[in-house]
C-alpha cells in the first residue's frame, strides 16, 4: 500500500523503496518533514521530504512520498 499523504508517514515506519532496476529494499523512517510545518527547533521546510535509514545505516532522502510502500 502506498502513502496518500505525508501526514500518514510515522517515525519508525518500515517502508519499501524500489530502485531504478526494480530491486526493493526495506528502510525505517527516521525524519519526516512536511512543507510549511515548523519543528521543535524552529525549522520550516519548503518541500515535503522523508529521510530513511537502511539496515547498514545509509540514509536516503525521498522527496515524493508516493514512492514508498508501507510494510503492514
Go through each PLM region and give its residues.
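Mixed-charge, Lys/Arg-rich low-complexity intrinsically disordered regions
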Residues: 1-14
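Short amphipathic beta-strand/extended segments with alternating polar/hydrophobic composition
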Residues: 2, 27-31, 60-66
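Short polar/acidic secondary-structure junctions
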Residues: 8, 20-22
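A short, compositionally biased
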Residues: 9-11, 44-48
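Short beta-strand-centered aromatic/proline hotspots
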Residues: 22-39
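Short, surface-exposed linear segments at secondary-structure transitions and domain or protein termini
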Residues: 37-41, 69-72
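Intrinsically disordered, low-complexity, charged/polar segments
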Residues: 46-72
